[in-house]
A protein has these predicted regions:
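Phosphate/dinucleotide-binding and metal-coordinating scaffold of catalytic cores
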Residues: 1-11, 26, 31, 41-301
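Intrinsically disordered, low-complexity mixed-charge segments
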Residues: 15
Length: 301
């Protein structure tokens, strides 16, 4: 009889042939970086809408027996039954708010099925696997920057990712958080994660903060491309040294490897590119510059 766990691994990832691509190093060439006023224009308030209303409430009554960062969340999301509550508004892909229940435990979550993804000309499909991979990378590094995210093969609309819903302060985003000194270390950690994951869509609104001042990174599907595609709003730390904790975690990753979970989710080319990025960031020892002024997502929030 076939092993169902082995079959699930095959369903999650099919190995493909690849040609190794060199790692793009120009982000670290400071002499090529033009320090002019054009970059600062991207931060002007008139380029994104600031919500002047009072603190927003969650669009439904949040209730859960398991919190987003709890160890029990992985078991709940991996094995719980899924009930679709509704379609999330303003999402570029099919994204659903769901309720996950297992025994007496329950929590809301975000479900992103593969069948709801819009094809992209410059990015491979199965973005949901990259959502899971970003969580697994954050977990393996000990960063804790991404809400618990699991792969579900059996789900209402087919295979996809399931991520713990964060009851965040939704009026907040990166541009309201970056000047708070007590959050700097968390933001630097997230910046380091995005460098390794090659995040191509780190908008300001993808940085959430909860009532405990924990920063969470969501919408991580555009990541782990084997080509250099870094696009992020987090450039405030350019030239600053990597935090010791982040550097030590990267070194440990290089010594121990990506781990079985990431290997199942990424192609061999993506795995090698991830390790090359880690080596490069660690070797440089500081956060890179955007020498082009174009490595930003749009819209910014």
């Amino acid at each position: 009889m076939a092993d169902p766990n082995e079959q699930q691994k095959q369903d999650l990832h099919k190995e493909e042939p690849f040609e190794e691509e060199p790692f793009q190093e120009d982000l670290y060439e400071e002499d090529l970086y033009e320090d002019d006023d054009s970059e600062e224009d991207l931060y002007e308030e008139d380029l994104y809408e600031e919500d002047d209303s009072e603190e927003e409430s969650i669009p439904f009554e949040y209730s859960a027996t398991v919190t987003p960062g709890a160890a029990e969340m992985t078991e709940l999301l991996s094995r719980g039954s899924i009930e679709i509550l509704g379609l999330m508004p303003w999402s570029s892909n099919g994204t659903y708010l769901v309720q996950v229940t297992r025994g007496e435990d329950y929590a809301p979550a975000i479900y992103k099925p593969e069948r709801g993804e819009r094809p992209l000309w410059d990015f491979p499909g199965a973005l949901w696997k990259r959502e899971v991979a970003t969580y697994e990378l954050s977990r393996s590094l000990g960063f804790g920057s991404v809400p618990t995210t699991v792969a579900r093969v059996s789900a209402p609309m087919g295979r996809g990712s399931l991520q713990a819903f964060v009851p965040a302060l939704f009026s907040e985003h990166y541009f309201t958080l970056r000047d708070r000194s007590e959050l700097a270390e968390q933001l630097k950690t997230l910046c380091a994660l995005d460098l390794i994951a090659n995040s191509a869509d780190r908008k300001g609104g993808h940085c959430l903060i909860d009532e405990h001042n924990q920063i969470w990174a969501i919408d991580n599907g555009l990541s782990f491309h084997e080509e250099a595609k870094l696009r992020t709003v987090i450039w405030d730390f350019a030239g600053e040294p990597l935090p010791n904790r982040s550097a030590e975690a990267m070194q440990h990753l290089l010594e121990t490897g990506l781990g079985a979970e990431l290997v199942e989710l990424l192609t061999p080319a993506e795995q090698q590119a991830t390790l090359r990025r880690t080596q490069q960031v660690l070797a440089e020892g500081h956060f890179p510059f955007d020498r082009t002024g174009r490595s930003y997502p749009w819209p910014l929030v």
